[in-house]
Amino acid sequence: MPIQVLPPQLANQIAAGEVVERPASVVKELVENSLDAGATRIDIDIERGGAKLIRIRDNGCGIKKDELALALARHATSKIASLDDLEAIISLGFRGEALASISSVSRLTLTSRTAEQQEAWQAYAEGRDMDVTVKPAAHPVGTTLEVLDLFYNTPARRKFLRTEKTEFNHIDEIIRRIALARFDVTINLSHNGKIVRQYRAVPEGGQKERRLGAICGTAFLEQALAIEWQHGDLTLRGWVADPNHTTPALAEIQYCYVNGRMMRDRLINHAIRQACEDKLGADQQPAFVLYLEIDPHQVDVNVHPAKHEVRFHQSRLVHDFIYQGVLSVLQQQLETPLPLDDEPQPAPRPIPENRVAAGRNHFAEPAVREPVAPRYTPAPASGSRPAAPWPNAQPGYQKQQGEVYRQLLQTPAPMQKPKAPEPQEPALAANSQSFGRVLTIVHSDCALLERDGNISLLALPVAERWLRQVQLTPGEAPVCAQPLLIPLRLKVSGEEKSALEKAQSALAELGIDFQSDAQHVTIRAVPLPLRQQNLQILIPELIGYLAKQSVFEPGNIAQWIARNLMSENAQWSMAQAITLLADVERLCPQLVKTPPGGLLQSVDLHPAIKALKDE
């Protein structure tokens, strides 16, 4: 058979084999086009599981009459124009293949009107050459796409369609995923003339949990822990279910989005699973709805025919970022049981962590339990006090316990003979537990502090080094080891290998786990403060240091590591300085009482004040 150019219809049908797998694939492509057009309302009508009819109507910007024919042509799109656009894609579609592929295996009709046009126009393609016919029509601003008799001209594909119920369930799942991605869009889904789903838009700043509950169910909502995590250009937000209460049914909720695009990414799933593995059984899976925002230049979405997968340019960074974000919210959720007193005490009141550097010292207040990760709290009844926004919401509770908790909260506390008040320091004395208030950043790495009218300078890199040393030094329990996604394998000499074997127990207390063979050592886990470090530089230097030692004390090794860690902040900001000082005050109180000279230096203002007065 000679080489020949395939007819347009056959070429489109071949492309449809990748894009149009089943009716749900058609719905996904068309709804994503509506979202790219700026629609705020999308109505989806399905008949016979999508095999008979798929109708998508939106109120987006519409398509101009002159561009209708192009819209049904292959490789025609308004979303990209150059390679630079492709490498930083932010729209859901970009290849320009969907409409041409769908129209080649169905009877597709496209009706659209823009705000500038007085009338709407309708286009459809037919025949071997896919000639497009355009005619006037009646239609509001927006677009309607009707897909009739899917796979009518490809009997083999139609034969592989499942039952009407199964195909509609796939469509329903696609709409659920899209509705979770765009809370600002109203989506209505009907099947055989009956409304099945109505997802109302959530206004900016509104309660997204209401829609989350409508999609994922109240069981997920009651166990959902809210996540807000950011590092540089990476942002992670959403919800992860408490692993201690995750059921097999709940574990079916696994939705992940990258820049608003729904994904099935093994790297992301691995990071989440690894963060939850201590609380999940071997055969359990986590439940989550997570949104990852990343610089579009750092992710390639053009790696899968149906755009279900992406490739990250810095996959290790993304994995560790997600792992730490999920792990942090799970660690906040853990509560250490408090010893029971002989007499009942008032319920603990969660307060934010210490931020004396910003102007207030919460450590001067009565001790309370640590706040847990935020969960969803149901909205109050009409006329009651509004519930707090979810970042500050109280822990969720099981339905059967709700009434009991409500009664307990409404029951007045029994009268008790007041205890003699214990002597307490006045509130101002709490300043002894803090460095003071951050006024500004000087020379990019020093914080100018004010305390009791005195001014001092604090070296932020030195404070960070002290904090890292405390975080690395094992207490009653060893430092928690964080497994590396890609273990680090290094070649070592006989002397270095011998030193590592002698220091193995001390390194294990610091959270550093390794395996050694004849001439190599493989680092399998490191403590959390080392996750963002360049381990290919730090670990060889650490091995060289150990080879020169005769005694291996965890404290000395932790001190050496802390002194050799690279700071994550070349230019310190006020927020970073405040956060650092709060952590140092909490974990290193001895530094506040007796700060070393290399950390804190007082600034004498008297000569300057005297000079001003003399003038």
From Swiss-Prot:
Signal peptide: none annotated. Residues 363-397 are annotated as: Disordered. Residues 378-391 have a biased composition (Low complexity). Keywords: DNA damage, DNA repair. SMART domains: DNA_mis_repair (SM01340), MutL_C (SM00853). GO terms for molecular function: ATP binding; ATP hydrolysis activity; ATP-dependent DNA damage sensor activity; mismatched DNA binding. InterPro entries: DNA_mismatch_repair_CS (IPR014762), DNA_mismatch_repair_MutL (IPR020667), DNA_mismatch_S5_2-like (IPR013507), HATPase_C_sf (IPR036890), MutL/Mlh/PMS (IPR002099), MutL/Mlh/Pms-like (IPR038973), MutL_C (IPR014790), MutL_C_dimsub (IPR042120). It comes from the Bacteria. CDD domains: HATPase_MutL-MLH-PMS-like, MutL_Trans_MutL. GO terms for biological process: mismatch repair. GO terms for cellular component: mismatch repair complex. It holds the Pfam family HATPase_c_3. PANTHER family: DNA MISMATCH REPAIR PROTEIN MLH, PMS, MUTL (PTHR10073), DNA MISMATCH REPAIR PROTEIN MLH1 (PTHR10073:SF12). This protein is involved in the repair of mismatches in DNA. It is required for dam-dependent methyl-directed DNA mismatch repair. May act as a 'molecular matchmaker', a protein that promotes the formation of a stable complex between two or more DNA-binding proteins in an ATP-dependent manner without itself being part of a final effector complex. Belongs to the DNA mismatch repair MutL/HexB family. This is DNA mismatch repair protein MutL.
